[in-house]
A protein has these predicted regions:
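HKD-type phospholipase D/PLD-like phosphodiesterase module
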Residues: 1-27, 33-178
Length: 185
């Protein structure tokens, strides 16, 4: 069986379509964890999946570090449509993660929020992976955060998790560079 290669999404070049298509591809389950989720067509796609019988859970960051609450309207709209939605874990100052998991088989991790400006004005990236180890780890963290439980990542899980292993893993990655290292921040 051939592994499905990762799909890179480059914004603003690729626009909304790859994200919309990914959300719309969910047949059994859809997990969305977002720092900011206000883009109307993506909210509608999420609600459409719920209306199609998909088990949808959405976790939103309650407020930004400055105190503004960008997700309140989205929270209410999703809740009203029957989507299982809740605020992210209070264990963290903010939840800055941007992830979407479809059918427990594929995960999108991105630097962009689900807001129109990230698909039209800013340089951001996303990747869709089918790597079962990575997908499962994203699900495990989602479930831990959903239940407000601690999560300790595996040392070599392949993913970096802030407040856990990110500094160690990032330093290890940088140390492995033998000729070049390109960083965009």
């Amino acid at each position: 069986m051939t592994a499905i290669p990762p799909q890179l999404i480059v914004e603003p070049d690729d626009g909304l379509e790859p994200v919309h298509a990914f959300i719309s591809s969910a047949q059994r389950s859809l997990l969305i964890k977002q720092f900011t989720f206000t883009e109307p067509s993506l909210i509608a796609a999420t609600i459409a999946r719920r209306k199609a019988g998909v088990d949808v859970r959405v976790m939103l960051n309650a407020q930004r570090s400055g105190g503004d609450r960008a997700n309140d309207d989205t929270y209410q709209e999703l809740k009203h449509a029957g989507v299982d939605v809740q605020w992210s874990s209070p264990h963290f100052y903010v939840t800055h993660e941007k992830s979407i998991v479809v059918d427990e088989k594929a995960a999108m991790v991105a630097t962009y929020n689900l807001m129109i400006k990230y698909f039209t004005l800013t340089r951001d990236y996303g990747i869709i992976t089918h790597d079962p180890v990575h997908v499962q780890q994203i699900i495990d963290v989602f479930n831990a955060d959903w239940g407000h439980r601690e999560f300790t990542p595996a040392e070599d899980g392949g993913l970096l998790w802030s407040n856990s292993n990110s500094r160690y893993q990032m330093a290890r990655f940088i140390d492995k560079a033998s000729e070049t290292l390109h960083i965009q921040h």
